[in-house]
Amino acid sequence: MRRQDLETLFGFSYWMKDRVLECAAKLTTAEFQAPSGLTTRDLRGTLVHTLDVESSWRARLQGQPEDVWKKELPLGDYPTARALIDHWRRDEYQMKAWLATLDDDRLAQIYDLEPGSAERFPLWYYVLHIHSHTQQQLGDAAVLLTRMRQSPGNIEFLEYADFLHREGTRPEGHARVRAGRQHLGSDRKST
């Protein structure tokens, strides 16, 4: 997998995260912390866990000491979504900066997560794992928000692509789509 592809996927995750946090910020503290009988964690727990996993996996893959990436973010530090937003923006900046340092050859190298372990994969497997975990958790958060009447709306990849097109931007390294392209429109079927 190429770095520019991973940067696009992480751009999508951060766009999705922003939609989810924007809705979560409209909740009262009690709503944000309300127990969930639907998912493994409540909304706050889901979002803090998501940030924690992104941050700790990045630190681990960067070779930081175990005491840095092993500790968990305390839920009590994030009583509201607003408290979480600033931390996540800083982490997003750090993640994007780290991704920018990885070239395609580095991503293809086998990464020995635990020396001596049989589980050895290219670095891009682990980076993609961070992205897919975030997608799953943000999907859970979106379900919880929807049940609280604060739906983030459609947060699928093509919605992100349409957003970029409307903004006149595109993921780094991707050619602009020619004006004569076929338009699928908003009648796409969601899966």
Can you say where each PLM-predicted feature lies in the sequence?
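Conserved small/polar residues in nucleotide/adenosyl-binding loops
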Residues: S190-T191
